[in-house]
Amino acid sequence: MSRHDGRPWAAGESGRGRAYAMEEGRDDREMGGQLELESGAAVPILDGAGARPIQLPPELDAEVAIASDEAFPLEERLEAFENVFESEVGDTRLARARNIERETGLRQLYLKFDGGNPTGTQKDRIAFAQAMDALRRGYDTVTAATCGNYGAALALAASFAGLRCEVFVPSGYHVRRAPEIERYGARMVAVEGDYEAAVLRSREEAESRELYDANPGGANTTIQLRAYGEISYEIYDELRDAPAAVAVPVSNGTTLAGIHKGFLSLYRRGKISRMPKIIAGSAYRKNPIVQSFLSGAEACEDLDPSKIRETAVNEPLINWHSIDGDLALDAIRSTSGWASYASDRSMANFSRLVSSSEGLTVLPASTAGLIALLAEDRRHELANDRYVVVLTGRR
């Protein structure tokens, strides 16, 4: 292969520039195409999105005052909360990453930065949707399990809606957003075991005490897929058609499945001319969706819980059971997409690349989709087209 300018590549260089290379000592097939930046060793970076004060304009403060006050009629509270929801959540930045294009050689690369949401991640989209549903149905308390980001989002949404919030966290995790969650008025309960154990406890409490269950899966799947589908509509609003591919970091698979559902709706209504390929990226050997895709499994298969280890970088991505894994796997395969792994080091390095090149401070785990996209471009040079990477959280 030759360079774009006709000169041959030096040994060890890739056909798409020198910004990335395969991790040393690991087979390309084993890593699922994982990439490493050619920079120094990664430094520890916190997993949770950065906590920042939530400052609303006076008119929205007035809406929150109505939504959170039980003295107002339910219809007025719902309207006020919806006004805050529509104003503050979603409609996040989509911008062309020209500097990363120059680093990698992949042209027409767009970054969809969901760190612009109130608590800094895409989880605000589903948290506000669930709080809206809870308020409409007459609940006074919402509950969910979390390792940090969803708990912060749900606690904020509940406080705006005048709802109590109980968040269940796995005792073995260091929830760095705990002070923020409590500051929003939520009650935190530690649960022995992993995230899945915390989900089970939250659901049991919801059933026994008649609380609103805001956990992913089950009856909430439709609500959450619709909420994440808004990402697709926002991309369409900017590009006026579907990109060639959309790359997303995955954990439970809900965000990816929702984005696919949104584009499918646009395609069926004749708004877009094609379905984008759906790409998944996640932590190395710690996510059932990527593992199942690479192994060729027909359905999303659980991993061995004893082999899942949390780090300061991979926490937003890891689990042994992906709640919406089957939906995510179907989205990848039905669009002829792909999935690959990302190591902690590569995610930390790409986080620094996004910061230095495009001025966005992102969670390292948010770059797993970008890594998966560039891995495929390294192996099989992608066509000159438009590509979107969803960056799910700010640092």
Region annotations inferred by a language model:
Residues S2-R395:
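PLP-dependent amino-acid enzyme catalytic core
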